[in-house]
């Protein structure tokens, strides 16, 4: 199991550290470290602090993703999903949420607002060429394999 250093910031005292909901969950729930209720109006967005900072090992990233229940039931989504936390970032993990629903959504301290997946990252070295191998799909893009 990968060990990751985590720093609980002052705003995160009293909140759980990011945690897996089930033994086989891929994502860790992130908790809102807000001092007072935060209202996200329909069409609006907000930045939600989580009260934690990470020291990811080289070769890893943290991906910030929407929680499926918030997205399906309330239209609350991570705006830049997946958001990437690089291994050299040391600031507080902050989640940008958007309300694509039709009603105000209230975020309270300790609410689970997003999921975080720790994933390996492969760096690349470009090999510039004059052509690339043809495939049966070719340049077919959006919708070319069906909808």
Curated annotation (Swiss-Prot):
Disulfide bonds: none annotated. This enzyme is involved in nucleotide metabolism: it produces dUMP, the immediate precursor of thymidine nucleotides and it decreases the intracellular concentration of dUTP so that uracil cannot be incorporated into DNA. The keyword Transit peptide does not apply. This is Deoxyuridine 5'-triphosphate nucleotidohydrolase. Keywords: Hydrolase, Magnesium, Metal-binding, Nucleotide metabolism. Transmembrane segments: none annotated. The keyword DNA repair does not apply. It comes from the Bacteria. Its EC number is 3.6.1.23. Coiled coil: none annotated. Its cofactor is Mg(2+). One of its GO terms (molecular function) is dUTP diphosphatase activity. Belongs to the dUTPase family. Pathway: Pyrimidine metabolism; dUMP biosynthesis; dUMP from dCTP (dUTP route): step 2/2. GO terms for biological process: dUMP biosynthetic process; dUTP catabolic process. It catalyses: dUTP + H2O = dUMP + diphosphate + H(+). Substrate binds at residues 67-69, 80, 84-86.
């Amino acid at each position: 199991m990968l060990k990751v250093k985590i720093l609980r910031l002052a705003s995160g005292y009293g909140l759980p550290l990011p945690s897996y909901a089930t033994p086989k969950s891929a994502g860790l729930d992130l908790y809102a470290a807000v001092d007072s209720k935060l209202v996200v109006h329909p069409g609006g967005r907000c930045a939600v602090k989580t009260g934690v900072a990470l020291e990811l090992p080289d070769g890893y990233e943290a991906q910030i993703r929407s929680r499926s229940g918030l997205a399906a039931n309330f239209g609350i989504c991570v705006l830049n999903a997946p958001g990437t936390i690089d291994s050299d970032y040391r600031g507080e993990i902050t989640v940008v949420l958007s309300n694509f629903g039709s009603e105000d959504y209230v975020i309270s301290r300790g609410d689970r607002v997003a999921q975080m997946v720790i994933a390996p990252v492969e760096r690349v070295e470009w090999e510039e060429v004059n052509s690339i191998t043809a495939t049966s799909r070719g340049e077919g893009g959006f919708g070319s394999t069906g909808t």
